[in-house]
Amino acid sequence: MSMQTAPIKKITLNHLQAKKNQEKIIAITAYDALFAQIFDPLVDVILVGDSLNMSFFNQNDTLNASVGMMLYHTKAVCAGAKIPFIITDMPFGSYKDEKTALKNAIRVYKETQASAIKLEGGKEKAKLVKTLTDEGVIVVGHIGLMPQFVRLDGGYKIKGKNEEQQKKLLEDALSLEEAGAGLLVLEGITTPIAQKITQTIKIPTIGIGSGKDCDGQILVWSDMLGFFDSFKPKFVREYLKGKELVQNAIKQYADDVKKGNFPNELESYH
């Protein structure tokens, strides 16, 4: 008689780390309870990303996202999604030193049901990662193209194109792993070095614009579903023409109202 595996009620870091070299991790962003509930049974990880500042608030970059903003949207996502591992981005300026980082990370844990926090930076952030993990906070690292450094870098630039960058990326990954990071996001990294990092470190890598060899993939939901069309990165694959579908539905609704076809008798009270 075969034993059936009980369904997972809540995905943990242990579940994700067990997928290393076994099964790809599926991750997506979400910013509210409605979409989090839709994504809930279909993904392993939901990132409440500071990307919301661009896709949700229509800003040019992520830099003026605030801790309050991230807490608000994380609470909403946690209300909608019960199964996935939920990661909250630490916004720009919220982890500038250990005291500030601890204060804000602890707020995330106390005020939301987030599973982990994510911060950008390489080996220079290793000491901070260790401090946070020593206090019981699960930290997700983020190296490569780092949106919070976009003004310093002069734009969104792919990393790993030369030997010096490749060496630094590998050193960054190893340092963050040693410091206690539970997962590592690789963004905008050339495929060969993303593959090497994934094969070298023991913790799972989640890629965005970093080739297919990472342990998992993440996309911004509004990019993937075709709602955000003002700019489309090379690495984005659209699985739906969401904006077009919604606009067509609104046009049909408006047409029905103008022609007196909505509401009809079945949609009215007597």
Swiss-Prot record:
For the ligand (3-methyl-2-oxobutanoate), the binding residues are 50-51, 89, 118
Which segment of the chain is annotated as a signal peptide?
Answer: none
Tell me the GO molecular function terms. 3-methyl-2-oxobutanoate hydroxymethyltransferase activity; magnesium ion binding
- What UniProt keywords are attached to this protein's entry? Cytoplasm, Magnesium, Metal-binding, Pantothenate biosynthesis, Transferase
Q: Which reaction does it catalyse?
A: 3-methyl-2-oxobutanoate + (6R)-5,10-methylene-5,6,7,8-tetrahydrofolate + H2O = 2-dehydropantoate + (6S)-5,6,7,8-tetrahydrofolate
Identify the Pfam families for this entry.
Pantoate_transf (PF02548)
Q: Which residues bind Mg(2+)?
A: 50, 89, 120
Disulfide pairs?
Answer: none
Q: Which cofactor does it need?
A: Mg(2+)
Keyword Cytoplasm annotated = yes
Q: Where in the cell?
A: Cytoplasm
**GO cellular component annotations of the record:** cytoplasm
Which GO terms are recorded in the biological process aspect for this UniProt protein?
pantothenate biosynthetic process
Q: What is its EC number?
A: 2.1.2.11
Broadest EC class? transferase
* Record-stated family: Belongs to the PanB family.
The job of this chain, per UniProt, is described as:
Catalyzes the reversible reaction in which hydroxymethyl group from 5,10-methylenetetrahydrofolate is transferred onto alpha-ketoisovalerate to form ketopantoate.
Q: How does it assemble?
A: Homodecamer; pentamer of dimers.
Could you identify this protein by its name? 3-methyl-2-oxobutanoate hydroxymethyltransferase
What organism is this sequence from? Helicobacter pylori (strain Shi470)
